[in-house]
Amino acid sequence: MAFELVGLDRLGTRMKIIFVRHGEPDYRELEERSYTGFGIDLAPLSVKGRQQAQELSKNSLLHSADLLVSSAVTRALETASYVACATGLPLRVEPLLHEWQVYESGVENFEKARTLFLENNGSLPPNSPFQYETAEEMRSRFLKSMRKYRNYQTVVVVTHRMLMRQFVPNEKIDFCQVIECEIEI
């Protein structure tokens, strides 16, 4: 697993964030039943994803935190449960740490919107064929949701790749990858 320290300048109280991307999910059962939108977010971790989360939970860096905050999405929450059991950290579920929102249905539309998002540096071009959450909206959503945790110096945040990418320069973020950064909340 890769570990990095990234400094970011924002307004307010300085907080060390230990970002963790969730483990590999298994969408098969939900896809077989044609779940879409937030329904697909009910997917649990795959067998490999559980192994990744178990390995992640051995990371000594996680023990340096004061609190564990997780997205309410099943794959993130299941990953966080392994971390909570291994570290004894108190766990808070934060519904606003969900994955990037695309206001179109279907995997194909999601991927097309993702390509458009990346090509436009996170902005939504005028007359875009796809509607989605911009990078600025994601950053704002994250910062607003984390304000209530200002009294904690170091927080583990189990969340999703697109949200993490708004705060760290990594283009590729693997399942259960750990990335440290400091953010002004």
PLM region spans:
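Acidic, low-complexity terminal tails and accessory targeting/binding regions
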Residues: 3-16, 59, 92, 97-114, ...
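Short, well-ordered beta-to-alpha junction loops that form the rim of enzyme active sites
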Residues: 70-74, 96, 158-162
